[in-house]
Amino acid sequence: MKKHAGEYGEKIRWVNYRTGVNSIRFKIEAFKNTSRVCIDIVNKDEGVREVFFEQFEEFKTLLSNSMNPLDWIKEYRIDSGVYITRIFTEINGPSINQESDWGDIYRFFEKNLIALHEFWEISQDVFQDLEN
């Protein structure tokens, strides 16, 4: 992913992507036979999560044009027992445990992270305004 820089040539931290919005995190996950690119809304306040979720819904067409299909889950329980809101796309089949599948997983992550980055460059200001 090093070959993909930001709009002004800046280095992008793909694994620890800085959204600039405390309540929003971009996350990648790889399990035995499933890999995901996620948008997590992590604010402890359910009402705040709802407002951010509704704003993402306003951008649903734009987001879905590049990251498809997307699952939209208002209450997603993470391993720690905390509830977050999650929007994600996933690929089933390629296994992180099979080296022969790594290329498919990499291409899935690359395509969707670039699409997410391009979406974020367009919409980030709206979400930053919501947080303030």
What spans do the regions from the language model cover?
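Polyanion-binding interface signature
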Residues: 1-92
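Ampiphathic alpha-helical segments that act as solvent-exposed interaction surfaces
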Residues: 93-131
